[in-house]
Structure formats: C-alpha cells, structure tokens
C-alpha cells in the first residue's frame, strides 16, 4: 500500500485569507499537507517531520514589535522553506534582512521580471515576447523587503516592489512577495509544483484511490470487529463517510436516516433508494416529521428554530443509538476545514472562526468512540473520493442545503402546509434551472416561503394565497455573493409554472440582494 503521509508539507498560518488555498493547491499537486498556527513549538514540528515548510501571508506588519514570527527551528530543520508575502517578509527579517512599510499598499495584478536563476522559477515564463522571463502574479501587501538577508539573491522584481522574490539556493530557502496559491497568478500551480515536487522531493501519492485505501485500512485498524453508528443525512460528507465505512466494515455499520419533514421533495425516498437499494447499506429510516413539527409549533425566531431542530435531532438519534446495544463507535463526517476552524492557537493570536458542530467531542452521556474518516480532507477532495466510490456526480455537486433544511426557508413559524407548498415550488425552480443549463452556472439556488398572502386572479375567480421568493446567487467562497442575473424569460417560465401547478401560491418574486448586506439564506 502507498504511504500517503510519507512526504508531507507543513503550512504555517499567519492569518491570510488565502491560507487554505495554499493547502488545497499542495493537495491538488498530489502531496499531503497540514495547516498549523504559526506559533507551534519545535517539538511539534519535529514530531510532524515535514519534507518542506511553507510560511503563509498574513494581515500583520513585520515592522511591529509583537508581529508573528516563524519558530526559529523552521530555518534549522534542514528542509526547504517557501515564504509567501508576509511569510517572505518574516523570513527576510528573521535571517538578517530588512523590511519597511510601503508608501502604498499593492493590491492586484503585477508583472514580475525574473532575475538570476532559481529552482523555484524553473521553466516558468508568462511573457514569451519579453527579453527577460516574466510572471503575471497577484499582489496583496503593505510592507516590503528592502535588504536581502546574507546568502540570498534577488530573483524577481516589479516596478513598485524592487525585491519581489528572493532565494538562497544552498539552504533551499525561497521567498515570493506575491500569492502563487490564487488562480490570478498564472503560473502559480507550476511554481508550487517546483517547490513541493522538484525542490522538496515529494512523491505525489495523495490521490483519491490511495486516500480510499488508506482510510479503509485505518477504519479497520481503529474499530476492528466493533459496530459503528452513523447519522446519514444524504449530504456529501455523511454519504462519503457511509461508503468508506461500508467498504471497511460492511454490515457492522448501522446508518440512521432521520426524516425530519424539512427535506426537499422526495428526498427521503431518494436517500433510502440510493444507500439501501443501490449500495446495500444497513440503514434505518426514522420518520420523525410529526415530532419535529410539534416541537416547532409557535416558534418563529430563526435561531430558536435552529436550536430546536438540533435538539430534536439529537434526541431522536440518541434514542435510535440506544436500540443498537452492541454499537461501540459513532461516525461523523467531520472534514478538514471544520478542524482548522475549531483549532485555537495556544497564544490566542490565531483567531477561531467558529466552533463547528462536528468538532469538540460528544455529549457526555454518549459513551462511544469517535470515527472521523474525512478528518484530513477538504470539501473538493471529499467530492473526488465520493466519485471514486461510485456516488453520482449530480448528487456530489448539488447546491448546499442548510442543516435545519426547510426550517430556515419557511420564514416564521413552520407548518406542514407551508413545507409542502415550498417543496413543490422549489422542485419546479430547480428542475427549470437544470433544463435551461443554469443550475451549475449559479452557486446556490432555492425557494423561500413568505408567510404573507397576496391577491391573485385565476380564470374568472379571485384567489388570496401565499407568496414565495426565488433566490439564486453566484459566489466563490460564500463569504460574499452576487445575485444571479437569470434571464427574464426563464424567471417568467418558473413563475408561471409555480403559480399554475402549486395550488396555494399566488405570487412569485425574485430576490436581488447581494451579500453583503443580505445573507444568502433568509434566516
């Protein structure tokens, strides 16, 4: 079996918004890497035993007294080091160079002229018409290096940044002021490949097939002949977790699918057909619609609804798990970004974005071991694993669906009537997006039920029925988003179908709010 962790890159995070992108690019190259806060100890680095180290960018200034520094051991570990943006600046300062604040922040595209020979830029040139090789890059920095450390040579320069890249070929230390991890830097992936593969000497074993083989072996080693329980929702993470576990332990996996009555049209049947009939998993369906709706009666505040849905789910799942008396382990679909977001730096310098529901252990009363086979994987890697395991692409690439389901897409109090109307309207919206080729052009699309009535005319009669809003957005990271400019004729067709086919809806509106100021979901 290939050892997928034999060669590995350590990425130290100084707080850049692009840091996770560095890790995803290294994984894309085919090499395992981990992302740690910058203030790790020498002992932790020694134990991880990296083949190479990358220092990320960050928002701080190296000219300030308390700014983050790389552990000194990074430069004494005997492995190649690449500093990106702030990472280059702290490398320069810590090794005897000088950095100063720029007269202006440089943000956007730039052309770097390459000087002197360096292994980092081998075979790279984005301007074949120039006498000197050049790279089209993305800059985002305030400070700049003004004096090279001893042993370093200048390898790149721009009109506003005289030292845009530097290298010490004997120690294999490299610095770039730009961001090779973003797609705006044309040869960024090739540059990172030069560092990870050619300079660090990593073998590219990190592939879906090898990851599956490794995950199955680790599950077998962890749980042996014990039985495992998993809450299967039909989402990407729990679905891939289920198939990995099934491949490893077969019928010793018990899947519990809690149908809360807040799912999309026919979704419960589709989950059972997919995992029960097609893949042959040991799966129990718990029809808990009445229980959820009863618990939600009279609750109209969004956060209170979320908490109640979460509480009822835990109660239902706990009851089912107690019926499985021989179960010793609980499986969860925790993925790597969940782990990163929940890891607090020991100095408090690295900010915790949020505490994720999948990280931080189990309720005290659940005396089960924890199995997390996706814990090392990014979402795009989970999808690739799912594809290799036989999950259909349309399921793996489906738009995000919130954990509370329709509970946050029915505004105000949740009633069965509202959910049924919303399910039908949303199914028409999604079907028409598929048929028109727009589904994969937008990042997320859904329908929202508004608890207001509007007058309509059907034939010779007057009707007074409910209103729904269509929402479609385009985004890269879901942190900001633009509303999607769907064609008017498509919106008209969707509206006509919903009003004519869904008895109880008299008006359809389209949400043209961006994020910010609006959030993507209404609640």
UniProtKB/Swiss-Prot annotation:
A GO cellular component annotation in the UniProt record: cytosol
Pfam family, one: GATase
Recorded superkingdom: Bacteria
Keyword Transmembrane: no
Domain spans labelled Glutamine amidotransferase type-1: 8-205
Gene3D superfamilies: 3.30.300.10, 3.40.50.880, HUPs
InterPro entries found in the cross-reference section: Class_I_gatase-like (IPR029062), GATASE (IPR017926), GMP_synth_C (IPR001674), GMP_synth_GATase (IPR004739), GMP_synthase (IPR022955), GMPS_ATP_PPase_dom (IPR025777), NAD/GMP_synthase (IPR022310), Rossmann-like_a/b/a_fold (IPR014729)
Keywords tagged on the record: ATP-binding, Glutamine amidotransferase, GMP biosynthesis, Ligase, Nucleotide-binding, Purine biosynthesis
Pathway(s) it belongs to: Purine metabolism; GMP biosynthesis; GMP from XMP (L-Gln route): step 1/1
E.C. number(s) listed in UniProt: 6.3.5.2
Reactions listed under catalytic activity: XMP + L-glutamine + ATP + H2O = GMP + L-glutamate + AMP + diphosphate + 2 H(+)
Active site, per annotation: 85 (nucleophile), 179, 181
GO molecular function annotation: ATP binding; GMP synthase activity
Residues at which ATP binds: 233-239
Domain GMPS ATP-PPase: 206-398
Xref: PANTHER family: GMP SYNTHASE [GLUTAMINE-HYDROLYZING], GMP SYNTHASE-RELATED
Complex formation: Homodimer.
Annotated NCBIfam families: guaA_Cterm (TIGR00884), guaA_Nterm (TIGR00888), PRK00074.1 (NF000848)
Function: Catalyzes the synthesis of GMP from XMP.
Protein name (record): GMP synthase [glutamine-hydrolyzing]
